[in-house]
Amino acid sequence: MDRVQYEPTPMKSVSMRANNTRREFFSKSKGGPMVWRNLFFPTEILNALGVKMLTLETYAALFARNYKRTKKALDIAAYKGFAGETCSFLRVLEGTELPQPAFGVSTSQPCQQGERIFQDLARQYNFTDRFYSLHTPINADDPYSVDQIAEGLQEAVYLMEKALGMKMDPARLAEACELSNQAAELSKRCNELRWTSPPLIRGAEGVYSAVLFSQLWGRQELIDIQKQFHDELCRKKEWAEKHYRIEDTHRLLWLHLPPFYDTKVLDYIETVCNAPIVFEEVNFVDWDRLDPADPYRSLARKLLTVGYLDPKLRVHYILETAKKAQLNGCILYNHGFGRCSLSDSCFAKHLREELDNVGLPLLTLDGDCMDPTTDPCSTLTKISSFTESLNAKKFGNMFGRIKGA
């Protein structure tokens, strides 16, 4: 079969995301007080409060393609005592000069190592008395979890109000929840289009949008981006269905994060092996609508059900997505060679057992999202072997669909 093609019109939503990222992370405008956050503390709260936020893991990832800068940061972190067993995202943060914050917020799960590093950074930047760690249980079924997290979120807001001399406007928080709902609904519609169509965009494009981790939840900008993206997907669906049926191609799911320093691995999968990645876990949106009249409990439920805190729930989401999207394979990128709790051996074992039950193969790729020097030489060989086995199962030979067949 010839290489899978895509509707060629450049996507405006990509440039909209890029422009927003530049404004969010590199703008010199003062805005409100700077608040550091980790990937999971609700942005709806920070956007409603009117602060300027910095998502630390995202900030680190933005420098991954600047190898000299990343290497320098990793070297500085090593000099400070942080060796390879520490996550490379966190080592980059330890080795980078960060904007001075007025406050910091984080969550105890899912990355406990990140929590310890953030507390160390708070000590270095002299704001330990203005750092709040939200204790986050991982069991979404626990009847006390929602109340516990909701109380923690309210406490975080109280402490920020006190430290920053600001006051949360309940009307603005309610508005942020409603804006978040609109963006979530658009995101779900985008996902449904991708699940029920031939490949619409390359996974190498989709995975870097990572809407789940956007700072824009609770703002109009995310609605505008997702509306534009939805319109583009509709156009691409119309084109794709004239050229392919869903069953004509492989349909892979990418799990966890990608390498941020280049797209070599993703390109090899999709271009050389002709195996489209039709969806990415970092774009999965399926939480309940937020209740603007009960924002803290709603955001607590969202945090519990976003998919990354509870491994059992995460595996359930993957299985449900596999069914809806008619997947025939999954790829888990094992950032940190098993040191990251989001792709470690326990999770991989759990996931593999459940996927085996439904006959869906899983490829685990060891690697590092930030440090290309640790990339195993066997990665491309493993991908080739995996896609050859998919070809044999789907097309009856290891090379893929034969022309005219």
Label the predicted regions:
Residues 347-405:
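Peripheral docking tails and interdomain loops at the edges
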Residues 76-95, 306-320:
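Glycine-rich, highly charged phosphate/nucleotide-binding loops
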Residues 88-159:
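Acidic/His-rich segments in extracytoplasmic proteins that coordinate ligands and/or metal ions
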Residues 2, 15-27, 35-37, 43-44, ...:
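Metallocofactor- and cofactor-centric catalytic cores in central/energy metabolism, strongly enriched
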Residues 315-359, 363:
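C-terminal hydrophobic structural anchor segments
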Residues 1-33, 150, 154, 158-289, ...:
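A charged, amphipathic alpha-helical module
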Residues 40, 45-70, 253-319, 323:
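Redox- and metal-dependent alpha/beta enzyme cores, enriched for Fe-S-associated oxidoreductases
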